Amino acid sequence: MDQPGTYQSGMTQPSVSQPAMSPPGLSPHNMQQPGTSQPYMNQPSMNQPAMNEPGVTIPDSSQSDINQAGQSQPNMKQPWSSTNQPGIYKTDMSQLGMKQPSASQAGMSQAGMWQPGPPTSDMKTINPWQWDPEYSGREPSDTWQITQSNQGTGQSDTVQEDPSCAEQKQPDTWKQDPSFPGMKKTEPWQWESSPPSVRQIDAWKWDPDHPGSNQLNLWQPQLSDSSTRQFDLRQAGPIELGKKESDTWQLVPSQQGKTPSSSGQQDPSQQIVRHAVTWQTGPSPLAKTLSGPWHIGLNQSGMEQLNTCQTGFGQRYSMCQSSGSQSSMKEFHMLQSGSNQPDMNDVDVWQSGTSQPGMHQMDPWQWGHNYSGNTQSGQWTPGPNALVVGQFDSWQPVQPGMKYSESGPWSPRHLDMRQPSPSQLATRQFDKWQQNPSMPGVRQLYTWQPTSSFSDTRQLEKFHPCPINLNMEQFWEAVSRQPGTTQLGTNQLDTNQPDGTQSSQGGKTQSDKLEPSPRKPEMKGSQPDTSQSDSDHLDISQPGPSQLEPGESSMSDLNESQQRITQSPMGKKDSCSFFIRPAEPEDCPDILRLIKELASYEGMEEKVSLTERDLFRDGFGDNPLFYCLVAEAPSEQTESGVKTIGFAMYYFTYDPRIGKLLHLEDFYITEDYQGIGIGADMLKKLSQIAINTECCGMQFLVIIWNQDSVEYYTRLGALDLSCEEGWHLFRFNLDDLLELAEEE
């Protein structure tokens, strides 16, 4: 019992509920009187939808939530002396350790209590807000008081001093977490303190114990109390949902004995101190470029800077942490800017530091130098000066949470898009072929960034995700090479500078008889180079597991073939740089031209009835019937600056005895460009595609009188099934099919 004028701090009756003490007709759970203390009484629904007088709250006709001005009730939960926006502050009976700021009672404390009475000597108040100026100088060391004499309150922007307007709750406040009884969980925009023994996943903190809770749009710029994981920030007025505040958040002084939470709370007496950072930005929803600058404060010794940016209502927030090693953090959607953060499983991670081993990151930004050792999917790694990576249709940041596989060939592209091509060791970011699950092998549509040799070529290519790694979208970039040099780990293919020299190819001596076509004898009239081993031209290497994906290895092991500048004794082409890439729809006219050129050589040009429309429909739709590789070389005779000099058409078939096969239907290199290694590189790429798509072999047809090609492929190890197995190839033409279809 609390008598008027008497402050009793030790009278508790644990686990005793006295509903009879309430007047008739009033709910004992929503009643507060200056009479008998009722310990452990749960008084939820402290919802006050309108402005009330400083000491009285009468929210409805049932007279629940009545605040009677008077002496402090030690064991009764009092509602907030302020206007609470719609939302409910629910307190569960199972919440142990409730805080009571006016009386120290073992096992009982209430969070968010506003008590007019002074604290006693034996009380341990944690984060009570006292508004009575009479006791402005008596608060204990661990007590925050918003009074006129308070000098240590760390409040950003505006502190509301009026008791009638104090501690306004923002919309969508407290609600019960069903998976954690007794835990108070807030929706966004919550400003109350929390119980000491309750992990509060509120709007301004990320709790790693509850990774499924996506809290958003809040800052954590100050340090929490040891028992209350609470950020004592106040902001003038309610915050509009879904908008970022352009305010400067200041660090709130923290108390001794705090337990740093995983969301970035640290005691100032410890070695690592987190500082709030100014973030000024306008409204910027997720999936758009973040507007406004973000400024990291000065890095002091062992300091961690915490910027938790706001990204709008209903969207995930990002958090930026700088320096300091943090182990076993599993915070999603964090911007992490530090060195050595092992064991982190971060999604949508911004990283601006040195190597971070052991990180598995989806869709990250990295603007550091080199990230060797990282295993990162769909990661864009620009050079040292490239802060913003050119993304699909513009130069803008990658949106957090966006998967590159969602921006496939149907996404808008940016014409004439240039991609910086600095050397980046051990990053498989370029030259990776990627395949759509419905389009096995290497899809024809890619992004190709040329160098100066290809400055006037078509800039637009398209992407297709790899079926093994659907979240990856990579660039296939042509990079200039210096003579006699090699680039390791950058996987930048077959971009050759016409400097008249030949790069060092270990054991490779390109002759004029390297790329015979299955249908056309490229070396007719000359003897095959019998001194060349079978591996001189194919060189199919077994890549590692990460390179066996169709999106990667079909191009990743061709660095030694970057520069094919050879001397041809036949006098057709003394030297030439060439580039092999997947075909795109714009290549249909050139492909048809090469098909007719091959048919003309074989004496069957009149049999070609195919049109460009047929090629486009059958090879570049949703379910392509064939795939193509094209070879290009610089040319001054074309407006684009390059000329298509060869192609390979293939598709997939099935052998009921051994399984999936890659069938090479047509393979042709223009006569002027034969003998400089283009056909050999084309075969190598086709072989890698067959391996990556889990084919059991590659088969093709060679015209019977092309003895040079027969000998060439036999030397490489191909079996002549016409001789080995005695096969004859038959075909029914359309007329025959019509007759067969009509037969009964």
Curated annotation (Swiss-Prot):
Its EC number is 2.3.1.-. GO terms for molecular function: acyltransferase activity, transferring groups other than amino-acyl groups. InterPro entries: Acyl_CoA_acyltransferase, Diverse_Substrate_AcTransf, GNAT_dom. Keywords: Acyltransferase, Transferase. Residues 260-271 have a biased composition (Low complexity). PANTHER family: DIAMINE N-ACETYLTRANSFERASE, SPERMIDINE_SPERMINE N(1)-ACETYLTRANSFERASE-LIKE PROTEIN 1. This is Spermidine/spermine N(1)-acetyltransferase-like protein 1. It comes from Mus musculus (Mouse). The gene is Satl1.
